[in-house]
Amino acid sequence: MIKQISQAISTFFTEHESVMKNFFSMSFMKGLEYIAPLILIPYLVRTLGIATFGTMQSVVSYMYIFYMLTNYGFSYSAARQISVHRDNKEKIQQIASSVMVLKILFMIASFVLMIIGVIIFPHLNAEFGLCLLTFGFVAGDVLLPVWLYQGYEKLHILSRFQIFSRVLIFAFTLLLIKTPEDYLLYPIIYYGIQCIAGIASLLLVPKLFGVHFIMP
């Protein structure tokens, strides 16, 4: 009985290896998004002070509005379309190009709305520079084509970018942020590295999938 169960489990994992690898990679990436900042929080609170750290977190919360706007369900709908048409390169190219153009347009609109909000609300206006730098959170998400890698069931490749970027963020944060005056360095480090990882993952798309981004 135990042997039969073991064989059944082994067969299931063999037949669905790609799907399972994709699932665990997605879970791992999501876990990193939450765990990595938590590791750094004690250090940042101690180095920057509770008030400054609280201000930084309130700005991040503000950016979540624009993060939701630029996502607009692409993570699921686009990934599903990529998966369905993965053998049709021309169709994939149209879908991928359209999604990237839309996300960039939404990002531009979000940036304009963000600036308007910063101008209107005094507590945000007082941290204009911090708001501009923290918008990198939105830009980094737009540049990282999770939906494309997910559609091709290649999230394990993207997870390597995430691991490497988190290691760099952790290292540079500890090396460069030493006083409360260094608080602007954190969004530069964190979101700058995220944007670079996103660009690198986009540059790999033609090589990995044979897909080129074109104007739709």
What is the role of each PLM region?
Residues 41-66, 183-188:
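Interfacial/gating helices of multi-pass transporter permease domains
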Residues 1-7, 15, 78, 144-156, ...:
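C-terminal transmembrane helix end/exit motif
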Residues 65, 104-108, 115-119, 123-148, ...:
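Alpha-helical transmembrane segments of multi-pass membrane proteins
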Residues 13-17, 48-52, 66-101, 150-156:
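Transmembrane-helix boundary and interhelical linker motifs in polytopic inner-membrane proteins
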Residues 35-36, 40, 57-83, 142-146, ...:
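Small-residue-rich midsections of specific transmembrane alpha-helices
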Residues 128, 132-135, 159-209:
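Hydrophobic alpha-helical transmembrane segments
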Residues 22-32, 90, 132, 136, ...:
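Alpha-helical transmembrane segments of multi-pass membrane transporters/permeases
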Residues 1-36:
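N-terminal membrane topogenesis motif
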